[in-house]
């Protein structure tokens, strides 16, 4: 080795491993308005200090690796590195912390949820120094939000397209979710729409199977929509699931839906992927289609409290990527969802501005500027007795979706739809008259059932049905 080479090797570089906290833990740092901020729930391995664990998360999700490398000297780490700038102990837990990390905006490709998640929730989640890691929340800066189109249309444009105001929208998932022929499927769609629903829906796993190919389903559902519209004088829709094995096939299905003149298509955004979802959202805006989003696979990611990613993060990502509706739990039905937490991310979906609110699990103030809002969809194990609570919890800007709660009616699909529409109209009228839905809900439904035999029959069938299980994902509270 030449003397010149030896001299260069000894200046500004020292091989070896050093603590992450020496570079990536910066409690004096004041986050910039342009930084993406993340709140991680960190459970270190025994003996790993919280500062080292938080710094490791910042490092491994930005510029760091396990050892010092030559090429660190070829760039400005201070400009590009993530910084763990604050750590809070989690109330009631012995070795768990909320670590706040700031990422410079230059780390991320414009308009790409895929790239953002590849960094922030990538390899770091398998890091051995951590027993568990969960991304609780993100603050998306305005500068980054403006690089996204967002939802194809948003809440107000959808209401104008449908000419429906002053109440939640009503939907129904066609059951059984798999096995029906396209013609029988279309018949069920027609009966539900004729009975008073605004929408019917493909289930998340209805794509293009041997028993019902997608093109046949689209044709029979379009026929059902037009027939129901002619009979009721209302605009109707069916969420035609365009999810496919390739992006090209997905867009082909959306093109066919547009050619049929239907108002809305659907996508499974987690199994389909954010790249596919963003592409479909762009197509929908350009071609006047509404986009319904199903969150199939979300519980694999978000249900465990200590590891994974909270749904509020997935909800924010969807608002960036694009969708006009997204499933958001029910609070009262068969699927996971604590009330305060659910209402927290429902507001993040709908509102332009949401303040930090620990009581609802919101770690950062979020401003969406001109990004349209997304309608939350309440779906899963709900029926007419839940209608007052759903109307009170979710308000007008929501979709209330009754699958079994429509198709399970003893008189058939259309009477099931009638029962739900009557129950909803009764709840909206009672609320507008100043009645307390939370306290008087059951009375309101009973009163309405006197004038609707369809509702009375539904009330009798589902009077004993409850799903009384505690939520797994709950707010942090001190152990008393």
Swiss-Prot record:
<keyword id="KW-0934">Plastid</keyword>
<dbReference type="InterPro" id="IPR036376">
    <property type="entry name" value="RuBisCO_lsu_C_sf"/>
</dbReference>
<keyword id="KW-0150">Chloroplast</keyword>
<feature type="modified residue" description="N-acetylproline">
    <location>
        <position position="3"/>
    </location>
</feature>
<feature type="binding site" description="in homodimeric partner">
    <location>
        <position position="123"/>
    </location>
    <ligand>
        <name>substrate</name>
    </ligand>
</feature>
<dbReference type="GO" id="GO:0016984">
    <property type="term" value="F:ribulose-bisphosphate carboxylase activity"/>
</dbReference>
<feature type="binding site">
    <location>
        <position position="327"/>
    </location>
    <ligand>
        <name>substrate</name>
    </ligand>
</feature>
<comment type="similarity">
    <text>Belongs to the RuBisCO large chain family. Type I subfamily.</text>
</comment>
<feature type="propeptide">
    <location>
        <begin position="1"/>
        <end position="2"/>
    </location>
</feature>
<feature type="modified residue" description="N6-carboxylysine">
    <location>
        <position position="201"/>
    </location>
</feature>
<keyword id="KW-0456">Lyase</keyword>
<dbReference type="InterPro" id="IPR033966">
    <property type="entry name" value="RuBisCO"/>
</dbReference>
<feature type="binding site">
    <location>
        <position position="203"/>
    </location>
    <ligand>
        <name>Mg(2+)</name>
    </ligand>
</feature>
<keyword id="KW-0007">Acetylation</keyword>
<dbReference type="GO" id="GO:0009507">
    <property type="term" value="C:chloroplast"/>
</dbReference>
<dbReference type="GO" id="GO:0019253">
    <property type="term" value="P:reductive pentose-phosphate cycle"/>
</dbReference>
<feature type="binding site">
    <location>
        <position position="177"/>
    </location>
    <ligand>
        <name>substrate</name>
    </ligand>
</feature>
<dbReference type="Pfam" id="PF02788">
    <property type="entry name" value="RuBisCO_large_N"/>
</dbReference>
<keyword id="KW-0602">Photosynthesis</keyword>
<feature type="active site" description="Proton acceptor">
    <location>
        <position position="294"/>
    </location>
</feature>
<dbReference type="GO" id="GO:0009853">
    <property type="term" value="P:photorespiration"/>
</dbReference>
<keyword id="KW-0460">Magnesium</keyword>
<dbReference type="InterPro" id="IPR000685">
    <property type="entry name" value="RuBisCO_lsu_C"/>
</dbReference>
<keyword id="KW-0560">Oxidoreductase</keyword>
<keyword id="KW-0120">Carbon dioxide fixation</keyword>
<feature type="binding site">
    <location>
        <position position="379"/>
    </location>
    <ligand>
        <name>substrate</name>
    </ligand>
</feature>
<dbReference type="InterPro" id="IPR020888">
    <property type="entry name" value="RuBisCO_lsuI"/>
</dbReference>
<keyword id="KW-1015">Disulfide bond</keyword>
<feature type="active site" description="Proton acceptor">
    <location>
        <position position="175"/>
    </location>
</feature>
<dbReference type="Pfam" id="PF00016">
    <property type="entry name" value="RuBisCO_large"/>
</dbReference>
<feature type="modified residue" description="N6,N6,N6-trimethyllysine">
    <location>
        <position position="14"/>
    </location>
</feature>
<feature type="binding site">
    <location>
        <position position="204"/>
    </location>
    <ligand>
        <name>Mg(2+)</name>
    </ligand>
</feature>
<comment type="function">
    <text>RuBisCO catalyzes two reactions: the carboxylation of D-ribulose 1,5-bisphosphate, the primary event in carbon dioxide fixation, as well as the oxidative fragmentation of the pentose substrate in the photorespiration process. Both reactions occur simultaneously and in competition at the same active site.</text>
</comment>
<feature type="binding site">
    <location>
        <position position="173"/>
    </location>
    <ligand>
        <name>substrate</name>
    </ligand>
</feature>
<feature type="binding site">
    <location>
        <position position="295"/>
    </location>
    <ligand>
        <name>substrate</name>
    </ligand>
</feature>
<dbReference type="InterPro" id="IPR017443">
    <property type="entry name" value="RuBisCO_lsu_fd_N"/>
</dbReference>
<dbReference type="InterPro" id="IPR036422">
    <property type="entry name" value="RuBisCO_lsu_N_sf"/>
</dbReference>
<keyword id="KW-0113">Calvin cycle</keyword>
<keyword id="KW-0503">Monooxygenase</keyword>
<protein>
    <recommendedName>
        <fullName>Ribulose bisphosphate carboxylase large chain</fullName>
        <ecNumber>4.1.1.39</ecNumber>
    </recommendedName>
</protein>
<feature type="site" description="Transition state stabilizer">
    <location>
        <position position="334"/>
    </location>
</feature>
<keyword id="KW-0488">Methylation</keyword>
């Amino acid at each position: 080795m030449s003397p010149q080479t030896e001299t260069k090797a000894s200046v500004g570089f020292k091989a070896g491993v050093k603590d992450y906290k020496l570079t990536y833990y910066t409690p004096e740092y004041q986050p910039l308005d342009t930084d993406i901020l993340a709140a991680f729930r960190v459970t270190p391995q025994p003996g790993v200090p919280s500062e080292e664990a938080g710094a490791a998360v910042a490092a491994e999700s930005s510029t760091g690796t396990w050892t010092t490398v030559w090429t660190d000297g070829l760039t400005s780490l201070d400009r590009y590195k993530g910084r763990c700038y604050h750590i809070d102990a989690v109330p009631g837990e012995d070795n768990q912390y909320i670590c706040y990390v700031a990422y410079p905006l230059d780390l991320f490709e414009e308009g790409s949820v895929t790239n953002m998640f590849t960094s922030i929730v990538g390899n770091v989640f398998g890091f051995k120094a951590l027993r568990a890691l969960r991304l609780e929340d993100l603050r998306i800066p305005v500068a980054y939000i403006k690089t996204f189109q967002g939802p194809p249309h948003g809440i107000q444009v959808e209401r104008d397209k449908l000419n429906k105001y002053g109440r939640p929208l009503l939907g129904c998932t066609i059951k059984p979710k798999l096995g029906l022929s396209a013609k029988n499927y279309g018949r069920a769609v027609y009966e539900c729409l004729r009975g008073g629903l605004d929408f019917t829906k493909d289930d998340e796993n209805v794509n293009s199977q041997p028993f019902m190919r997608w093109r046949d389903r689209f044709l029979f559902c379009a026929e059902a929509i037009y027939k129901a519209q002619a009979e009721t004088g209302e605009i109707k829709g069916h969420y035609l699931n365009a999810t496919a094995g390739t992006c090209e096939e997905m867009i082909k299905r959306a093109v066919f839906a547009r050619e049929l003149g239907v108002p809305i298509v659907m996508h499974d955004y987690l199994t389909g992927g954010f790249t596919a979802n963003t592409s479909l959202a762009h197509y929908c805006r350009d071609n006047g289609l509404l986009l319904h989003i199903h969150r199939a696979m979300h519980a694999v990611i978000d249900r465990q409290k200590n590891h994974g990613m909270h749904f509020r993060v997935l909800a924010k990502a969807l608002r960036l990527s694009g969708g006009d509706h997204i499933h958001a739990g029910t609070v009262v039905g068969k699927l996971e969802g604590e009330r305060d937490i659910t209402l927290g991310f429902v507001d993040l979906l709908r509102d332009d501005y949401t303040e930090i609110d620990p009581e609802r699990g919101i770690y950062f103030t979020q401003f969406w500027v001109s990004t349209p809002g997304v309608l939350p969809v309440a779906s899963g194990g709900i029926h007419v007795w839940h209608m007052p609570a759903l109307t009170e919890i979710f308000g007008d800007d929501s979709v209330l979706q009754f699958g079994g709660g429509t198709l399970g009616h003893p008189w058939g699909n259309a009477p099931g739809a009638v029962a739900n529409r009557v129950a909803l109209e009764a709840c909206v009228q009672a609320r507008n008259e100043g009645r307390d839905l939370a306290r008087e809900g059951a009375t309101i439904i009973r009163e309405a059932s006197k004038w609707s035999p369809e509702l009375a029959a539904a009330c009798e069938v589902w009077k004993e049905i409850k799903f009384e299980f505690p939520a797994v994902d709950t707010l942090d509270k001190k152990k008393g």
